[in-house]
């Protein structure tokens, strides 16, 4: 998967945020599907926007007043692993 990656997650308005630009819509949508499976596995679902080859993600936890928790940080790490499959666990 070829993409431009915002290196770090930003903390914006009490949410973790990342934007990723892919080669095309198909690669962006493939990434979204992979994130959907992760979200189900962790029972933690991101807010996202997809416009053609760009995917924007926000992570936050509803149960604590829409703030960032360890659950969000864990999900961010798992999403990053999808973007960099050669990361060692």
Regions of interest found by a model, annotated:
Residues 1-89:
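Charge-rich alpha-helical segments
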């Amino acid at each position: 998967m070829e993409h431009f990656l915002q290196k770090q997650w930003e903390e914006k308005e009490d949410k973790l945020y990342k934007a990723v630009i892919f080669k095309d819509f198909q690669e962006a949508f493939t990434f979204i599907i992979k994130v959907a499976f992760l979200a189900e596995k962790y029972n933690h679902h991101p807010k996202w926007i997809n416009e053609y080859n760009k995917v924007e993600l926000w992570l936050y936890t509803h149960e604590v007043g829409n703030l960032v928790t360890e659950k969000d940080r864990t999900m961010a790490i798992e999403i990053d692993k999808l973007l960099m499959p050669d990361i060692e666990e």
